[in-house]
Regions:
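Generic structural signal for individual residues within well-ordered alpha-helical segments
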Residues: 44, 95-98, 164, 186, ...
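Alpha-helix/helix-capping structural signal
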Residues: 74, 196-197
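Short beta-strand edge/turn micro-motifs at domain boundaries
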Residues: 19, 197-198
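GST-like domain detector, emphasizing the conserved glutathione-binding G-site
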Residues: 1-131, 135, 145, 219
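Acidic/histidine-enriched, glycine/proline-rich intrinsically disordered or flexible terminal extensions
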Residues: 205-228
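Short, solvent-exposed turn/loop segments enriched in Gly/Ser/Thr/Pro and often Arg
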Residues: 32, 160, 205-208
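Short secondary-structure boundary/hinge segments and terminal tails
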Residues: 36-37, 190, 209-211
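GST-like fold's C-terminal all-alpha helical module
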Residues: 104-196, 203
């Protein structure tokens, strides 16, 4: 059994997509990041960066005590190795997947995240920051579009690279992007959206009540942190 400590963010969606695709038994444990639940001492014991998602594998392969993993990319790798799915064993194919997973972790996610912040949430409009991150998001869409030309999925076969990237493309309109400008990306996006496991993952998200996440108090919690 996997305990998934989760909130309805792109990084959270990555893990529900994997778990639904792989058919691993799991339980969602909501962590309301707008209410500060990510600072609970128990959660911090296995997610020291106070971010979701994180998991606890209650039946790890070594037979030991529950194993905690934080950072969505590390979680995807861990689960792929556990399930022996969606991450090839052959080195060339494996690293084709991993380089795109890390591209998402180091590029698409952080840049689109800053896009969201300055376009949607910042208390003041800063034109330079907005333009900077909207343009960089656009550039990254172009990189992904080129990679997808002539193939159904990012690394050829469906993999954790697709699961990592898709949730960050879902809010493309909020990122001020037009999918029609990226035909290969748009075809992949539609292909992903039609997968039954992806549909189920987003249905699970809809069951989590996030109505009060972005209150003024929540924004202070989310965007006003310093070292603890």
């Amino acid at each position: 059994m996997i305990e998934l400590y989760y909130w309805t963010t792109p990084n959270g969606h990555k893990i529900t997509i994997f778990l639904e695709e792989a058919g691993l038994p799991y339980k969602i444990v909501p962590v309301n990041i707008g209410a500060g639940e990510q600072f609970d001492p128990f959660f911090l014991s296995f997610s020291p960066n106070n971010r979701i998602p994180a998991i606890r594998d209650l039946a790890p392969a070594d037979g030991g005590t529950p194993l905690g993993v934080f950072e969505s990319g590390a979680i995807l790798e861990y689960l792929a190795e556990k399930a022996q799915k969606f991450l090839p064993a052959a080195p060339r194919a494996k690293y084709e997947v991993l380089q795109w997973l890390y591209w998402q972790m180091g590029g698409l996610g952080p840049m689109a995240g800053q896009n969201h912040h300055f376009v949607q949430y910042a208390p003041e409009r800063i034109p330079y920051a907005m333009e900077r991150y909207v343009k960089e998001t656009n550039r990254l869409y172009g990189v992904l579009n080129k990679q997808l030309e002539g193939r159904d999925y990012i690394a050829g076969d469906y993999s954790i690279a697709d699961m990592a990237c898709y949730p960050w493309i879902v809010p493309y309109e909020r990122q001020q992007q037009k999918l029609e400008d990226f035909p290969a990306l748009m075809a992949w996006f539609e292909r992903m959206a039609a997968r039954p496991a992806v549909v189920r993952a987003y249905e699970k998200a809809a069951e989590v009540n996030t109505a009060a996440t972005m209150t003024p108090e929540a924004k202070t919690i989310l965007f006003g942190q310093t070292a603890r």
